Amino acid sequence: QNSNNSVRVSNDFLEAVENDGKWDLIQRINGKVCETVEARSLWDKISHAAWACADPGLQYDTTINEWHTCPKGGRIDASNPCSEYMFLDDTACNLASMNLMKFRHENGDFDIDNFEHATRLWTITLEIAVMMAQFPSKEIAIRSYDYRTLGLGYANIGGLLMAAGYSYDS
């Protein structure tokens, strides 16, 4: 509780789960195997914890790196705590979210024109933020400037769907 945890799994791990195989737990510092466990048992523990308290989140390492938009820059090894930003080590992302309910008219219509306009404005704002940001290290500043890491998302989709009359299980 009061933390945000993720577990990163590879396709090899998922295959070990499917095949009732064993899985080596690797120490991050020295790369040595510290324990070998039943993959399915570990998967069950991860799944139960996620069901019980919404943590850990899952990150699919193989897919993340297969879909990597800048693979020549290196592997994607980590994310920010909420996992909405996954990119190269020594980068930072300036994040913003737009509240979708602000684009809902009283009659229930979604204001696409203003949503598109706000998206353009926020993209420019985030671009300026990258140029003005004070990053914690020179390496992070250089890579963030080079790759222009912007993150524009949306919030309150649940509220928008409820206001439109969609039930949670639809």
Label each PLM-derived region with a short phrase.
Residues Q1-G74, Y166, S170:
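Conserved, charged catalytic cores of large soluble enzymes
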Residues A50-A164:
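Function-dense linear segments that define catalytic or interfacial modules
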